[in-house]
Amino acid sequence: MNHITLSGELGSGKSTVANYLISKMPFRIVSAGLLFRQLAAKHGMSAKEFNEFIENDPKYDHYVDDTMAELGRTDEKIIFDSRMAWHFVPSSFKIYLYVDVDTATERIFNDKGRVSESYTDKETARQEIIDRRKSELLRYQNFYHCNLDDYSNYDLIVDTSHATIDEVNTLVFNSFQAFNEGKEYTRIGLSPKSLIMEKNEPDDTGEKLIINKKDGRFIVEKGFSRVKKALENGKSLVAVDVVKC
């Protein structure tokens, strides 16, 4: 496979994973975020302002999308760091990185390298992350009739909220290798701390772990014992069989 598409939440670690992968394999990175930041700067806007500005004007999205699609038709080994690259480069290993909003806020607020996304306080950062996410979901739904939160779009979903950088990097790299070799791998890895269990759960040892994603929350439908065991053992990730979106 010559193409990897890397989508996910703001602050989920997409750039970190992409840089790790190119250190292990002869790929180069094409970043939609960089293209959009350049366009925003050209218009004298912040990333959030530019997202809102283009909600009803698809020409900027089409410019970036056409660039991705054209590169996706080549044999060059490319990692596409882009929310929608999985859609425009269908012949790819499609990765989605999730992170909860509180962890994303901490990461982005404390990352002084994000010149275009600097904030005076954490609450402002948190609200802008939420607003930007809503803006992007609306834009992609309106322009492409695509739901970024539909996990069936991806080959690998990883929750980076409570996993270490090394854990995430290793999991992504090993999963890509397994995918290329036609071997089985864990397709969905979520933090047990991100999973919500109702009171008086039944003892369901041996059940598949099935999650219902509703209003941005991961609610356990089956597999309570697996989640409890992962929490007791201090696991940063637990293998999930199904996420209903």
Where are these predicted regions, by residue range?
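Hydrophobic positions on the alpha1 helix immediately C-terminal to the Walker A/P-loop
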Residues: V17
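ATP-dependent small-molecule kinase phosphotransfer cores
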Residues: A32-V89, D102-T103, R114-E117, K134
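A short, basic-hydrophobic beta/loop patch
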Residues: T205-C245
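Small-molecule kinase domains that catalyze NTP-dependent phosphoryl transfer to phosphate-bearing small molecules
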Residues: E117-V168
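Conserved glycine(s) of the Walker
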Residues: G13
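Conserved phosphate-donor/acceptor-positioning beta-strand/loop module used by diverse small-molecule
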Residues: S91-V115, Y119-E128
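Short alpha-helix boundary/capping and kink motifs at helix termini
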Residues: Q177-I219
